Amino acid sequence: MLSILIPTYNDDCYELVQALTLQAKALNLADWEIIVADDGSTDGQVIARNKNLQDIPGCRFVRNNDNMGRAAIRNFLVEQARGKYLIFIDADMKICEPNYLKRYVMAQALGNVVYGGYIVQGGTKTNLRFLYEKQGEKNRSAQLRNNQPYKDFHTSNFMVSRKVMKDLPFDERFRHYGYEDVFWGKQLEVYGESIVHIDNPVAFCTFEQNSDFIVKTEEGLRTLRLFRNELKGYSPLLKVADKLERNKLKPLFACIFRVMGKRLKRLLLSKHTNLLAFQIYKLGYYLSLK
């Protein structure tokens, strides 16, 4: 049996589930299921829309009133699932490959963890999230990802055996945004479980406003700071920050950020937003954390 698992928080999953249902039916799989788990969404319209998923054959919608956290909601989905293989897809992704499910079914022979990647569609040059994702697109081919299989892994689109997920669940200390997937990739390497990268992308085409992305980024940086010891070697920003600290330059950079941080943030929120300013802001924000 194949289980398709979608954690959601304030994301409308209806079109995503419809696309997956059509592919599952076309494959004539012996048994399959789609489970959508709402992690305490607050948008009433989205909740109402997602409740209609229960009317789609093969789909189940589970609503949690409280927010469990990004790691815990995925572990919850594993407990709800019945499949031998599990496909995780983020709720804000879009199916862009007509043979998406077929490719994953065929890839089951390759390994217990298979990551399909993602592509970027739409967006504008004034949107910071779009610029950020678009910049990294050239490095997202399966060939390049396989060079660093554990460091180029994300939970937005992957297949995993039930056995691996039961043996290595997501670390539920990661309640807030960021790095739960990075740490899980590290755990796979520690325990000698291979990650196979293939070209089977979903599309990332929904980009939050610059202000929301900055808030999310700051939350991720606080997560990185909290788990900095566990994530050493798995974050380029952490590597730079540690080097500055070893050279006793952290106080200087933190001081500069206190003076320039608000100005940088205003730039990032404007139509002149750019990635160089974003990288400087991220480093400065991280170094200013206690």
Where in the sequence are the language-model features?
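Active-site donor/metal-binding and catalytic loop motifs
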Residues: 191-228
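Short aromatic/hydrophobic "clamp" motif used to bind/position activated sugar donors
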Residues: 86
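Conserved donor NDP-sugar-binding/catalytic core segment of glycosyltransferases
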Residues: 94, 98-129
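Acidic donor-binding loop at a coil-to-helix junction in glycosyltransferase catalytic cores
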Residues: 176-184
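Glycine-rich, basic loop-to-helix element that forms the pyrophosphate-binding segment
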Residues: 64-81
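Non-catalytic, C-terminal membrane-associated alpha-helical segments of glycosyltransferases
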Residues: 219-222, 236-290
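Acidic donor-binding segment of Leloir-type glycosyltransferases
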Residues: 20-63
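A recurrent flexible, glycine/aromatic-enriched loop bordering the glycosyltransferase active site
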Residues: 140-160, 176
